[in-house]
């Protein structure tokens, strides 16, 4: 699993490489998710991907397919950020 503040490179379905800063890794309902921020994008729009295993048992990041699951993770991360800001 990547460490926070690490830069990782992901390859999209077209074979293009994209660099992301790992902002946070959180666990929600037994699954782990990476909160990523594109390195070359000026926006503050985070990308949330789910940790999974491929057929060779390697750890990979995959899209969250369910809107409900995405909302749960986004809400959990927002709560964590709000709690940290309050400290």
Curated annotation (Swiss-Prot):
Protein family: Belongs to the UPF0473 family.
Name the UniProt record assigns to this protein: UPF0473 protein Dred_0776
Annotated organism of origin: Desulforamulus reducens (strain ATCC BAA-1160 / DSM 100696 / MI-1) (Desulfotomaculum reducens)
